[in-house]
């Protein structure tokens, strides 16, 4: 199954065990997000719990759980797969308060990628139910910053770092930036298919966020996955694209920005690649005729 899948199962089993022994409490934070099917930035090794009503934390410490104080209203609680948990917006807000910006952003973008109806306006409207706690303003700003195109936590990290570098002036020469853009290519057997790229800068510089999962065997035969990615990259390069791949270490450091700056400086300007399709990823997924074509 692979280490990644095993760790995910361990996460869910930990959450299940804690919930079984704490029947009056409600999951919140990253544990609730994972139970609701969202990606998290870090592995869940301790379960955040809250009590319905207006509760305070107490002194006893537990290795597998932590109790959070504050107001938890009935409308912020749901039951999912037999376990009581905070609704997603509250779980993500608590993740923001207790674990920081990056953890919350990964969860937000995971939710938005999986559920197209979760637009920025919809999520901001949902924050009206949240307690007037410290961090609410920053959380609302984070929602406005979030996107709906990140299919993985690594894509969220890369997207966020690039956008912040552009905004701060650390990364220059970016005239256009787009996410999840499709190109017509041929697969290894010669059949037409669509290659979706994670980030497209200036129309022709492609950034692919490659986590260990693609080549670990968790998504199928590892050697086959590597060969498939190499063929895909060659097809894109044949259209005039410049492809740069980044992993977790680069995406979380300035190495990503340095890599992109070198590439942009060496290849300035905007170009249009000939095999780009006009449909967005969301349009493609929801339109069977486009996929069939």
Language-model-detected regions and their locations in the chain:
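Short gly/ser-rich loop at a beta-strand->alpha-helix junction or flexible surface loop bordering the NTP-binding
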Residues: 1-135, 154, 159, 268-293
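Surface segments flanking catalytic/ligand-binding clefts of nucleic-acid enzymes
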Residues: 113, 118-293
């Amino acid at each position: 199954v692979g280490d990644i899948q095993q760790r995910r199962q361990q996460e869910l089993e930990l959450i299940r065990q804690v919930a079984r022994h704490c029947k009056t409490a409600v999951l919140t934070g990253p544990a609730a997000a994972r139970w609701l099917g969202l990606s998290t930035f870090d592995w869940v090794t301790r379960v955040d719990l809250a009590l319905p009503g207006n509760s305070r934390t107490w002194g006893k410490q537990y290795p597998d759980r932590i109790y959070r104080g504050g107001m938890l209203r009935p409308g912020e609680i749901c039951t999912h797969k037999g376990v009581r948990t905070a609704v997603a917006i509250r779980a993500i807000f608590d993740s923001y308060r207790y674990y920081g910006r990056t953890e919350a952003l990964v969860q937000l973008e995971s939710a938005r990628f999986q559920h197209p109806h979760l637009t920025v306006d919809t999520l901001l409207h949902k924050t009206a139910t949240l307690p007037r706690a410290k961090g609410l303003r920053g959380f609302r700003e984070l929602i406005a910053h979030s996107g709906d195109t990140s299919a993985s936590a690594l894509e969220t990290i890369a997207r966020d770092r690039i956008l912040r570098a552009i905004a701060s002036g650390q990364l220059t020469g970016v005239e256009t930036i787009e996410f999840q853009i499709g190109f017509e290519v041929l697969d290894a057997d010669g059949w037409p298919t669509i290659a979706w790229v994670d980030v497209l800068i200036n129309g022709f510089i492609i950034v692919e966020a490659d986590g260990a999962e693609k080549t670990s065997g968790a998504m199928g035969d590892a050697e086959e996955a590597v060969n498939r990615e190499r063929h895909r990259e060659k097809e894109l390069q044949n259209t005039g694209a410049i492809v740069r791949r980044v992993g977790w270490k680069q995406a979380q450091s300035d190495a990503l920005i340095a890599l992109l700056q070198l590439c942009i400086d060496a290849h300035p300007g905007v170009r249009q690649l000939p095999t780009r399709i006009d449909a967005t990823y969301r349009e493609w997924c929801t339109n069977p005729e486009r996929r069939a074509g």
